[in-house]
Amino acid sequence: VGCEECPMHCKGKNAKPTCDNGVCNCNV
């Protein structure tokens, strides 16, 4: 998942989306 889609991708989880080297991470 790209950075721009990260917030939507992580939505619904108690996540704080971060972007590392163009990769989306949902940090719970």
UniProtKB/Swiss-Prot annotation:
InterPro entries: Scorpion_toxin-like_sf (IPR036574), Toxin_alpha-KTx_8/9 (IPR008911). GO terms for cellular component: extracellular region. It is found in: Secreted. Expressed by the venom gland. Its main location: secreted. It holds the Pfam family Toxin_6. Keywords: Disulfide bond, Secreted, Toxin. It comes from the Eukaryota. GO terms for molecular function: ion channel inhibitor activity; toxin activity. Disulfide bonds join C3-C19, C6-C24, C10-C26. Signal peptide: none annotated. Belongs to the short scorpion toxin superfamily. Potassium channel inhibitor family. Alpha-KTx 09 subfamily. Inhibits voltage-gated potassium channels. Has the structural arrangement of an alpha-helix connected to a beta-sheet by disulfide bonds. This is Potassium channel toxin alpha-KTx 9.3. It comes from Aegaeobuthus nigrocinctus (Scorpion). The lineage of its organism: Eukaryota, Metazoa, Ecdysozoa, Arthropoda, Chelicerata.
